[in-house]
């Protein structure tokens, strides 16, 4: 069959992404030659995360075409979150459609979603990734492909700006990332939702429309719809009407540029963190703690024997860096210790570095505090040690 322009674009995008995760290195030599070749039963496996929607069905169809041409097995994993009536049937239909396309193995997993403080959307996402990672490990897949499009990227940028700020909010979703030891990739970030819809039409692939997307709702979506659905249905179209051009493409390109900046800042911050921050588990040695160099918090520095993570940050080392790097080092170090600090708390710790005039420490979540002693900032639980 003759491929449409959008289908050729998708094939190229998937092939380029597989190259990015070094899948081309495992291509069987005979698949570089013209002719019909059977994919070996023990060939490397790629899984497509499939919800049954238009984006993931388009990705499943295109990935099967590309993987087959490379001598790589292409399977699918469908996660049933159990949050909607009839979700089991939707998952089963998605699995059958993937099998009809030739994908195999096709894995259906049931997720347990437990919403806590982070909300239902975040809990469902965490549960989904848990199941995707488990499926990849159990099947031996070398990568899991996700069907996020350019439109999803634009929505992610807007959601990021609503919930946070700075270059991290603008950076959107990475094309390739690792989670719990599993490689994930997003081949369709350069394609629009209209193009994935068209690809399904080109290939005669049926798909399911999630009612929580609100596509059938006239007017503004109520607040009980997921935030992403409201951004997609209401906010993005309103911005496009105001701007008079395709803002999804604009936001997606901005995300690509911001991600390059973010990756450099993260790399540089990691280098500085390795030199400036020491992380230790309690209980530590009872040896005296130097106030000039970062090292373990001593057991005598705490009022109890509880186990936790302490940080020692070298003021002399971190003070030489620009503010953008200092703030990142502090944030990453706190995150490593399991402390989810606010932007205001991170900025207050930075003032202990660059605007030190004997001020008190900074109270942090989980009973942690950050206090400066000479040329070291100590981040420990209980905080009493810092005043000795």
Swiss-Prot record:
It is an enzyme of class 6 (ligase). One of its GO terms (molecular function) is tRNA(Ile)-lysidine synthase activity. Gene3D superfamilies: HUPs. Its EC number is 6.3.4.19. Keywords: ATP-binding, Cytoplasm, Ligase, Nucleotide-binding, tRNA processing. It catalyses: cytidine(34) in tRNA(Ile2) + L-lysine + ATP = lysidine(34) in tRNA(Ile2) + AMP + diphosphate + H(+). This is tRNA(Ile)-lysidine synthase. The gene is tilS.
């Amino acid at each position: 069959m003759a491929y449409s322009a959008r289908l050729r674009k998708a094939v190229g995008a998937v092939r380029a992404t597989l190259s990015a995760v070094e899948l081309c290195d495992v291509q069987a030599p005979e698949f570089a030659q013209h002719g019909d070749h059977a994919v070996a039963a023990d060939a490397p496996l790629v899984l497509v995360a499939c919800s049954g929607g238009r984006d993931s069905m388009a990705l499943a169809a295109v990935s099967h075409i590309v993987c087959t041409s490379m001598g790589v097995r292409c399977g699918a994993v469908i996660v049933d979150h159990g949050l909607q009536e009839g979700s089991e049937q939707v998952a089963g239909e998605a699995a059958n459609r993937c099998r009809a396309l030739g994908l195999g193995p096709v894995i259906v997993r049931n997720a347990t979603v437990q919403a806590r403080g982070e909300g239902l959307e975040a809990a469902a996402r965490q549960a989904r990734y848990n199941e995707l990672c488990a499926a990849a490990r159990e099947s031996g897949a070398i990568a899991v492909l996700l069907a996020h499009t350019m439109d999803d990227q634009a929505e992610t940028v807007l959601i990021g700006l609503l919930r946070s700020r700075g270059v991290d909010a603008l950076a959107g979703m990475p094309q390739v990332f690792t989670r719990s030891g599993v490689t994930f990739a997003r081949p369709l970030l350069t394609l629009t939702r209209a193009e994935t819809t068209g690809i399904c039409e080109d290939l005669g692939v049926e798909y399911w429309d999630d009612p929580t997307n609100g596509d059938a709702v006239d007017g503004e979506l109520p607040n009980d719809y997921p935030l992403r659905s409201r951004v997609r249905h209401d906010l993005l179209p309103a911005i496009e009407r105001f701007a008079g051009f395709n803002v999804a493409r604009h936001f997606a390109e901005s995300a690509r540029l911001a991600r390059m900046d973010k990756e450099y800042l993260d790399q540089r911050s990691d280098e500085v963190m390795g030199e400036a921050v020491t992380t230790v588990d309690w209980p530590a040695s009872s040896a005296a703690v130097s106030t000039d160099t970062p090292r373990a918090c001593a057991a005598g520095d705490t009022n109890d024997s509880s186990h936790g993570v302490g940080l020692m940050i070298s003021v002399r080392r971190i003070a030489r860096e620009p503010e953008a790097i200092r703030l990142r080092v502090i944030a990453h170090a706190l995150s490593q210790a399991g402390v989810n600090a606010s932007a205001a708390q991170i900025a207050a710790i930075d003032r202990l570095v660059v605007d030190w005039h004997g001020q008190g420490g900074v109270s942090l979540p989980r009973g942690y505090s950050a206090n400066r002693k000479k040329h070291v900032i100590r981040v420990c639980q209980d905080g009493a040690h810092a005043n000795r």
